[in-house]
Amino acid sequence: MQSLWSGYGRIQKVDLRFQESDRSQSAIVKFVDAAGAGEAHPRGWNGGASHTRKIRSYEVERNFYASFSSQCGDQCRVAKLLGADLHSPASESDWLMVLEDLDQPSHRGDGFPVRKSGVSEQELLACLSWLANFHAAFVSIDAPAVDDVLWPVGTYWHLATRWDEWDVMEPGKLKDAASIIDQRLNDCKFQTLVHGDAKLANFCFPASPGLVAAVDFQYVGRGCGMKDVAYLISSCLSDAECKRQQESLLNSYFNLLEAAVNARQDIEIDFSALESEWRELYRFAWADFYRFLAGWSPGHWKMHGYSDEITTRVLRELER
C-alpha cells in the first residue's frame, strides 16, 4: 500500500485465511524495518534524535493498540489489533502489527474506505466528534498509566523531542518563549490522551456521511485536547476559513466533548473548569505548533495570517 516515513518499513494489505474454515479476512500489516531505514528526509531532518524519536514512536503505537485501543468505542473508532510482537521491546530490528482493515465492513457496522484531501463542514465536524469522544475516553488519565508506555507528552512536535528544529529557528520572541509556551501546555490541569498527529489524512470516512475512524497512533500521549483540535483545523482550513470558523468549531467541539464526558459513569469532571482552561490554551497549542514549523519548515503554508495573529497574541500575553 505505502512505505513508512523515511523508509522505516511499509504498510500492506493482506488476506488472512483461517485453517478451521474457508473464511478469509483482509487485514493491514504494518512492518517496521528499523535497521533498513535511511531514506533522505525531504527537509534534511535525518539526525540521531530523529531516528530515536521514530523508533520510539512505533513502540508507542504498538503499546497503544495493545493496551489502550479497547477503550475507544464506536464514537472514536480505531482498528482492532489482530496480532503483534508484544512481548519484546522495540529495538534496532524488525517487528510488525496486524490490524483490522478499517476499509471493510465488520460486525460493528460499515467500513471506512474513503480518504479526504478536503472536507465539508459536516465532515470536519465528524472529525471533531471523533476527537471529542477520544479525549473524553481518556480524560484525567493517570500519568503512571501512560508515561512508561506512551509519550509522557503527546504530539510529534513536542519541544522536548524537537530541539534540533528549535536550534535553527531565527532568533526572536517566539524562540525565546518556546519553553514557556511548552510548559504552559504541560501544566494543564485537565489532561487526557491526545492523538498527536490528528491531521485530515489520518481520518477514515465512510462511503455515506457518518462517524469516522482514525489511524496512526505513533505520537499518542498525555496533554491538552486543544493540541489535536488546533492541528486538525490547521490541516483542513485556509487562513480566511480559520478566522471565520474558529469560534463555531470550538463551540461544536466543546458541546460534543461535554456530551461524551457526561456519558461516562466512572468519573466526575468539573466540565466548566475544563472548558475554561482548554479554551484559554487553544491559542497556546496553535503557537506551539507554529514554533515547530518555524524551525522545521520556515514559510510553510500553515504559517499564514491567522497563525501569525494567534502567535503574536500569545507572545504579548507572556510579556505582561
Where are these regions (language model features)?
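Short amphipathic beta-strand and strand-loop transition segments with alternating hydrophobic
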Residues: 1-3, 82-86, 179-183
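Active-site acidic catalytic loop and adjacent metal/ATP-binding pocket
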Residues: 10-18, 28, 180-227
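Conserved ATP-binding subdomain of kinase catalytic cores across diverse folds
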Residues: 7-12, 17, 21-153, 225
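Active-site activation/catalytic loop segments of kinase-like enzymes and analogous catalytic loops
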Residues: 50, 63, 219-264, 285-304
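Short helix/strand-bridging catalytic loops that position acidic/His residues to coordinate divalent metals
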Residues: 110-120, 214-219, 232-238
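ATP-dependent phospho-/nucleotidyl transfer catalytic cores
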Residues: 107-195, 204-207, 302, 316
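A short glycine-rich, hydrophobically flanked beta-strand micro-motif that places a catalytic Asp/Glu
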Residues: 79-84, 203, 269-277
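Regulatory N- and C-terminal appendages and interdomain linkers associated
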Residues: 1-5, 17-26, 93, 268, ...
